[in-house]
Curated annotation (Swiss-Prot):
UniProt cross-references to InterPro entries, sorted A to Z: ClpS, ClpS_core, Ribosomal_bL12_C/ClpS-like
Described function: Involved in the modulation of the specificity of the ClpAP-mediated ATP-dependent protein degradation.
Protein family according to the UniProt entry: Belongs to the ClpS family.
GO biological process, one term: proteolysis
UniProt cross-references to HAMAP family, sorted A to Z: ClpS
Pfam families per record: ClpS
Stated name of the protein: ATP-dependent Clp protease adapter protein ClpS
Subunit field text: Binds to the N-terminal domain of the chaperone ClpA.
Segments crossing the lipid bilayer: none
Amino acid sequence: MTAQLHMMSDKHDQDNDASVLLQTRPRTKRPPLYKVLLLNDDYTPMEFVVHVLERFFGMNHAQAFEIMLTVHKKGVAVVGVFSHEIAETKVSLVMDFARRHQHPLQCTMEKED
């Protein structure tokens, strides 16, 4: 909490004592952030993963291709860091989109350290 100190004097204060007024303002805490992760599988086409990254995470083709290769080689990649609600929505959108296109692509989220 931050505090501001204000000195106040009273005209009628015979002893010239100063009154102290302490105002506190609560410091708001930033909400926790969550990493959205894309997981590799042996069946989802690479082109589909690139399309998902462009469509749901606003990446250009080169960025999406680079992340897709990371997912392919390492098995997982962070595709973005968001507030809880946004991360949850992105995971849901990606999973629904993959399911509609009959791909087993997995997308998860975890709290950022």
